[in-house]
């Protein structure tokens, strides 16, 4: 049996919220409730580094789903990855060595 468009939409929104919670600590609805004055969705207000991290997490989430990892486990793992990646992306680079 094929899923209906409504079911597909719900599944997609649910997976999007896994990424939202891992990255921002809240679902899209929670963010909208906290920011009723904002015109766009939470990702539209994300920084470039947050968007880079989200893109990476979307790819990793697909791999984790393919591996059969349960959603709760994926959420924890993605949150740990988001924290680590944001540390790297936000690093000012003062202690890095360059290839020059």
Feature locations, PLM:
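Positively charged, phosphate-engaging catalytic surfaces used for nucleic-acid and nucleotide handling
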Residues: 1-100
